[in-house]
Each structure stands twice: as structure tokens, then as C-alpha cells.
């Protein structure tokens, strides 16, 4: 009797902690703004489009850190458009000659 009771308490504790973790993950992601409808006034549509633009910027922003792989860093260095930050050789400088 006590063994089954202990099993049920542990299963209930696990299920509750799993629900808490899933709830925390769901709150961390921004929710899409609600559409005001087709016949909404211009002010409501402007607010909706502003909120939608903010939402899209949040979910598509670039992430740095552990997600940056060495391959992407190398390709960024090789395919860089500006050459002002690339170190030059000593022999390319005319003052050396």
C-alpha cells in the first residue's frame, strides 16, 4: 500500500513539474497580435501593423553566442563587403619602401 502511494506521489510530482516547465516555455515566446478585423478604423489598423512589425522583429532577430558556428563566422569573414577591417600586409604599405 505504501509502495503504490509513493509511486503515485512521485508520478504526480513529475507531471506537475513538467507542466510548470512547459508553462514557462510557452510564456517566454511572444504571442502574435490579434487582428482588429476588416472593418476596423485606421488607428486600430495602424496599431495592429505596428504591433505586428514589432512581433516579426522579435521572432526573426539574429541570435549570437552558442548558436554561431565556426562555419558561419568563417563565411562572414570571407564574404564581407567592406575591406576596412581586414588586416593588410606590411608589403602593401607604400611607406615601407
From Swiss-Prot:
Main localisation: secreted
GO biological process: feeding behavior; neuropeptide signaling pathway
Record key words, sorted: Amidation, Cleavage on pair of basic residues, Cytoplasmic vesicle, Neuropeptide, Secreted, Signal
Superkingdom to which the source organism belongs: Eukaryota
Molecular function as annotated in GO: neuropeptide hormone activity; neuropeptide Y receptor binding
PTM sites of type Tyrosine amide: 64
Annotated CDD domains: PAH (cd00126)
Function per UniProt: NPY is implicated in the control of feeding and in secretion of gonadotrophin-release hormone.
Protein name: Pro-neuropeptide Y
Amino acid at each position: 500500500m505504501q509502495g503504490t502511494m509513493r509511486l503515485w506521489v512521485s508520478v504526480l510530482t513529475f507531471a506537475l513539474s513538467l507542466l510548470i516547465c512547459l508553462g514557462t516555455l510557452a510564456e517566454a515566446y511572444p504571442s502574435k497580435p490579434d487582428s482588429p478585423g476588416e472593418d476596423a478604423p485606421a488607428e486600430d489598423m495602424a496599431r495592429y501593423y505596428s504591433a505586428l512589425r514589432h512581433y516579426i522583429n522579435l521572432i526573426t532577430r539574429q541570435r549570437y553566442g552558442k548558436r554561431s558556428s565556426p562555419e558561419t563566422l568563417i563565411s562572414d569573414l570571407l564574404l564581407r563587403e567592406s575591406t576596412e577591417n581586414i588586416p593588410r600586409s606590411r608589403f602593401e604599405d607604400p611607406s615601407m619602401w
